[in-house]
Amino acid sequence: MNSRKKGMTLVAKQRTAGWLFLAPASIMIAVMSFYPMIRAFIISLQTGAGANMRFADPIFSNYKRILADKVFQQSIVNTFLYLIIQVPIMLILAILLAQLLNNKDLKFRGFFRTCVFLPCATSLVSYSLIFRSMFATDGLINSILIKLGILSTGYNFLGNATSAKIVIILALIWRWTGYNMVFYLAGLQNIEYSVYEAAKIDGANGWKTFWKITVPLLKPTIIMTFIMSINGTLQLFDESVNLTKGGPANSTITMSHYIYNTCFINVPNFGYASAMSFIIFIMVAVLAFINLKVGDTRD
């Protein structure tokens, strides 16, 4: 009887210790994540500014306004265009680079890994300004194209809606490919080499080995990077602000950029900005849920 009581006391102590260790992190998550989300939803139902904030009448008027806001609709189209084009290209490049740089016979692979990873260590503002200067009418890209005889005069890449979007997509791919490559490298190094040897003995070529072994074993990592990339692209801000300032004529503006303008640049409207922010939150949550469901192979 005494031994049972002692055993129960030990279990109770372990549970208490576990909850004590868990409590600080749980409190921080609640304060830094859940409270702001709840507060943002409450503000999204209000109008006014500062101490004059009050609930709107009708209460969902900010959300109703979104349906008629052409600029916000344009920002959604722009953001999803970046998402649909940039994310797949970036992740495919990241997987291929990881596969290439995971080769044990490759010389200076540490140096090449560092070179590919370095772009994501640069400042967001700095790299945006570098791309802006490169694609200016008197920038490096125009100078090269003129010398090659492709152009006769400098082309305003950032002054045209289509080319400006392409510049933003190129900038995103350049910066974030190396970041995702690191995750795939870690995943590749956890795959036993004996698996590849067995496939080679069975007569599988390089493409079959990659498609039938590497990709399925990297599936959890691919899903994780895909969700992170979706989350990051839907909240895209720096490139739109620093590269094109949302122009020309809001043709490259992103959702986060428009929310920032609504909240701080134009006449401040915190309620409407919060409503748009909550729409982004719902988009991220829905897309993440779909990704997890599609990638879940458990019975």
Per-region residue spans from a language model:
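A structural signal for multi-pass alpha-helical bundles of membrane permease subunits
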Residues: 5, 10-299
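N-terminal hydrophobic targeting signals that begin at the initiator methionine
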Residues: 1-2
